[in-house]
UniProtKB/Swiss-Prot annotation:
One Gene Ontology biological process: ERAD pathway
Gene that this sequence comes from: lcl2
Protein name as it appears in the record: Long chronological lifespan protein 2
Region (Disordered): 35-54
Family named by the database record: Belongs to the LCL2 family.
Biased composition (Polar residues): 40-54
Function: Probable component of the endoplasmic reticulum-associated degradation (ERAD) pathway.
PANTHER family, sorted: LONG CHRONOLOGICAL LIFESPAN PROTEIN 2
Alphabetized UniProt keyword annotations: Signal
Amino acid sequence: MFSWIRLLGALLLLASVAHAQFQFFEHMFGGGGGGGGHQGRQQAAQNVPSDSSRYQSQWDSAHCDKYLCPGTLACVHFPHHCPCPHPDVEEKVELGEGSAVCVSKGGYKEGEAARKIELARKGLL
C-alpha cells in the first residue's frame, strides 16, 4: 500500500513539473500553437498605425510664429536650434552653416561624436 502512495506521489510530482515546464515555454515564446492566440491579438492592439494622421494633427494644432521643428515639434528661432528627439541617446552637432544633425552617442565620451563628424567632414576618417 505504501509503495502505491509513493508511486502516485512521484507521478503527481512529475506531472506538475512537466506542466510548469510547458507553461514556461508557452509564456516565453508567446503560446506556440494554439495557446498564444489571445496574447497575439492583445499585442497587435498595442501597435501604432503606420499612417501619419496623428503626427499631422499634432503639427496642425501646434502654435509657433517662428520655426517648428519637424522631429520634435519644438518652436525655435532657427532650424539648427531644434533639439534632438531622443536627447538621452543622441547628441546634437551643429555643422556650422546653419544646420545641425543628431547623432547617436554610441557610448562615446561627451563631444566624441562631434569630433568624429568633424574628422569625417575633413576626409580624415
